[in-house]
Amino acid sequence: MRRSPSRSNNNFAVPNCSTNSNSSQQQLTTPSDDLNSNEPNDPDDSRSLPTIKKFNNKHSINNYNTLASAGKNNNNKRASNDNLLIPGENAHKQKIYTKDENLKSLYLDIDVSVAKALSSSATAPKLINTARTSSTTTATTSNNILTSPSYRESNYSSPSSYSFSSYYSSATSASSSTSSFLKSSGLSSRVKSPSSSVKAGSFGAPSSPTSGIPNPKSSKKPIFLRRYSHDTSSNEGLDIDVAIEKLLQVGESREITKTSKKKNFPFHSWEIQLICYHAREIFLNQPTLLRLQAPIKVVGDVHGQFNDLLRILKLSGVPSDTNYLFLGDYVDRGKNSLETILLLLCYKIKYKDNFFMLRGNHESANVTKMYGFYDECKRRLSSKVWKMFVDVFNTLPLAAIIQDKIFCVHGGISPDLHDMKQIEKVARPTDIPESGLVTDLLWSDPDPQVTDWSENDRGVSYTFSKRNVLDFCAKFKFDLILRGHMVVEDGYEFFARKKFVTIFSAPNYCGEFHNWGAVMSVTTGMMCSFELLKPRALKNKKKLYKTKV
C-alpha cells in the first residue's frame, strides 16, 4: 500500500534568496541537492497567490498572434528580434498596493504536514485602489445591481465589440468615478443574512437537498445581474447568491454526468452570458500581474472535476471566510467543466477582492477544442456559450506575487522575462501566442535532466533547469516559485532545493491516476502548509507517472 503523503512532518525554512551566486553554484554541485523529501525526478508544477500592487502602465505589449495549435511543434529557437517588447498604449492602467515593509524580512517557512487550517479570524489581503480608463459606466445603486450589455444574446460578438452599460459596483464606491476595484476589508464584515429570491426569468433554486458548503447571503446588498440594462421596468436577471447555491446543490445531488443533456442544465444561456460579461469586466479592471498578501490559499489544476472542487471548498474553507488564488486549468478532461468554471466565476463576481484566478494553458480556444470543453459546451448548451467563456479566458491575469516572496504562475518561468513590468504591460484581452513570454508563463516546465533552457517535448515553450530557477529567484528576490500544469503523485512536489513547487488539485486525475490533490496554505507569517485531498477508491488502480497536462 502506497505511503500517504500526509504522514510527512517536515518543517523547513526556504533559504533566503540573498545568498550570493558563488555559494549557490557550489551548493548545486553537492550530492545533497537531490535529497529533499519531495524532490521531483521529472518536471513538476506549482501555482500562485493573491495581492495586488501599484504601478502606472505607460506602455503595453501588443497582442501576439493566436496560438495556431495547442500541440503544434516548433523548434523554440527565437531570433533576437522575437524577444523585443513592442511598446503600445495600455488602456487598462493599474496601481498596486503599498507593500508592508515589516514583512519583507520574513523567511518563508513551509510545513508539509497535512491540512493545517488557517484561523477563521484571518483578515483579507490589503489591496489598493486602481483607476482604469474604460468606456463602461458605473451604475450607482444601493443593492449592487449589475446590468448586461445592450445587445441580444443572438448577436453575441467578439470582445472588441463589447458595449457594457455598467459593471460591478459596490455601494460604498459608486460615488466616485475612480472607485477601487479592490478594497481593503476585513473578512469579519462579511456577515450574510438569508438569501433573497431570484427575480423573474431565472430558474428558481433547486429543490434538491442543501449543499454541505455554506453560501452566506446578504439581503442588504444582493448582487443582481440585470438582463436588460436599458429597461428599468424589467426585473429580469440573475441573483449571484441563487446561482452559487444552485451549483452547490447540483454538486450535492450528484446529478451531473458526462451524458447530461441540455434540458438538465440548471442555467439559461442568457444567464451564463451575464456571468461571463461581468466576470470579464472585473478581470479587466484588475492587473495582469496580481500582487497579493497573505493569508491566502492556492489551488492548482482542477480540470472540470467539479465534485473535487467542492471537496476543496469543504477542506480549505468557503470564499466568504478564505482568500483564494487559483492557478488555472479549470476546464477540459474532467466531466463537469461547465459547472466548475461557472462556480468559480460566480465566486469571482461575489468576492472580487478576495478570490483570484490566473490563466492556465487550457484557458485557450484551441486547447479547449482539443481536450473536451468545446464538446461539452456544444453537447449540453451551444457553441455560442463556449465562445462566451473563451472571451473571459482572454482577460484572465497571467501571474501573481504574494508578499514579494512567492511568484505564482500556471506553467513556469521564461528566458524572455527580465523585468516584472513586462508581465504588467501585457494588454488584455489576448490570445495565447505560439511563442514568447505569455506562452512560457503558461506552458514551460522544469526538468532536472537539463542544465539550461531546452526544447520542451510538448512542442511548445521551453524546459528549464535548477540553475535557471535559482537564478530567477535571486534576480527577483523570490523565496519560492509556485505553479501547477502537471499532475504529481502526492499533490505537491518540490524542485531546485525547494525553491520551486508544483501543486495539483485534481485527485485521481481523469479517473485514471491514484494521485492526491493538494492546496497550499500561506499564513500572514508566511508559514506554508499543504492541505491534501485523498483520491477516491479505484477499481483498477494505475501507477502514476508524472503527466503533463
Curated annotation (Swiss-Prot):
It holds the Pfam family STPPase_N. Residues 1-50, 64-85, 133-158, 189-219 are annotated as: Disordered. Its EC number is 3.1.3.16. It comes from the Eukaryota. Mn(2+) 2 binds at residues 329, 361, 410, 485. SMART domains: PP2Ac (SM00156). Mn(2+) 1 binds at residues 301, 303, 329. Residues 16-32, 68-83 have a biased composition (Low complexity). Binds 2 manganese ions per subunit. Residues 1-13, 205-217 have a biased composition (Polar residues). GO terms for cellular component: cytoplasm; nucleus. Its cofactor is Mn(2+). GO terms for biological process: chromosome segregation; negative regulation of pheromone-dependent signal transduction involved in conjugation with cellular fusion; regulation of mitotic cell cycle. InterPro entries: Calcineurin-like_PHP_ApaH (IPR004843), Metallo-depent_PP-like (IPR029052), PP1_catalytic_subunit (IPR050341), PPPtase_PPZ/Ppq1 (IPR011159), Ser/Thr-sp_prot-phosphatase (IPR006186), STPPase_N (IPR031675). The active site is at 362 (proton donor). The keyword DNA repair does not apply. Coiled coil: none annotated. Keywords: Hydrolase, Manganese, Metal-binding, Protein phosphatase. Gene3D superfamilies: 3.60.21.10. GO terms for molecular function: metal ion binding; phosphoprotein phosphatase activity; protein serine/threonine phosphatase activity. It catalyses: O-phospho-L-seryl-[protein] + H2O = L-seryl-[protein] + phosphate; O-phospho-L-threonyl-[protein] + H2O = L-threonyl-[protein] + phosphate. Present with 319 molecules/cell in log phase SD medium. Belongs to the PPP phosphatase family. PP-Z subfamily. Phosphatase involved in the regulation of protein synthesis. Affects translational accuracy. This is Serine/threonine-protein phosphatase PPQ. It comes from Saccharomyces cerevisiae (strain ATCC 204508 / S288c). The lineage of its organism: Eukaryota, Fungi, Dikarya, Ascomycota, Saccharomycotina.
